[in-house]
Amino acid sequence: MSEREGHGIDAPDPAYRRLPTEGPHSPALGGALITWVEPMPEHVVGYNRWYEDDHMITGAMSMPWMFSCRRFVAPRWLQHLRAPADSRVAVPLEAGKYIGLYWVNEGRIDDHLQWSLGANYRLHEDGRGSYRGRGFDPTEERRHVFTAFHDYRGAFYRDAEVPRDIHTLAQPYEGLVVELVDADPAPGREALHDWLESEHLPRMVGGRVAVSLRFDPRPLPPDKLGHVREPEAVDRRITLLHFLECDPRSVWAERF
């Protein structure tokens, strides 16, 4: 039992009643955390058990305004599909076998980000930033290939029967294809969004490719945890997530 000054034993913090009454409270998708990680070979089992049994919950899903999540894995028999060979993100090209996707409510990404920073600093101080416990360096276990919070820009659906964007991570999609596209400085990212929506995605989405979602990555906050790599070119980059109803290999030549 504990006592909080002025509230008696185990009194709830009044902020928990006040904060939900303020600001947006929309069911819409407003942003995402996309985190693409490569564990070191000798730490694969320990890292994944820690991530799914602890960090995926306490470092993400139990926080306010985050409402859906899913992980995908790129096994060896899919990694040969990756391109370009001189990728500036996946170095080497097979790096980043695990990707976590997390949806954040519209209008709440800034609020969620502040909670996330506080919670993750606490977890590291509590010795839960590593599956090995306090005092161990996370960079010995894993490295972040591409991790960023994103602003949502829209969806391109195959047809009206495809579940809406907010439900995407709850659907039993068999595959995910991720594209990171950098815009030329001129005409810039908005022109690239227009081209993607009017020309690129209509050719790509269809058949067993059910939906594609577009996101703009944000710079990581200056007080981020030190082991998380700062993504490059976030002011020019667009992240595309293509959700498939099949093994990616079966539609790769046709769609990608």
Tell what function each PLM region has:
Residues 2-256:
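Macromolecular interaction modules
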